Amino acid sequence: LEKLRTRVNNTVVDADNAAKEIVRDILRNRPVAFLVDQAGDPHKDIFVDFMGRPAVTHEAPAQLALRLAAPIIIGFACRKPDGIYAVRLEEIPFDDLSNTAEGRKELTKRHVAALENIIRRYPEQWAWQHKRWKYEAP
């Protein structure tokens, strides 16, 4: 999987040590991608509804976007009937939010809702191989 992710000049960074590298890339106007459908850490991330159930969700994309005025864009590929994949991008608006706990939670809700809408539109194309709801909300 990492070979596939890095074959077009991408770099994969370890999540535990990524903060400095991610901030540096954002400040250099380089794109940064997060796998936002993965479960977060229940001790440092936040719970928001995903597919009707509370799920611990990474807050870092919202925190970085609000702190650095970097856009959040959901990207996904859909297989068309002819077997060709179409890549689609959807920007998540957040001009009305500030970098507060409430603002970060609201932006996280928005990007999770956008992901959920994509999955509901193309459920047969969602490749899901992990426990998204492995932690109970407090």
Set out the residue ranges of the language-model regions.
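Membrane-interfacial amphipathic helices and adjacent loop/beta segments
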Residues: L1-D16
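Non-catalytic C-terminal accessory region of glycerolipid acyltransferases
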Residues: D16-P138
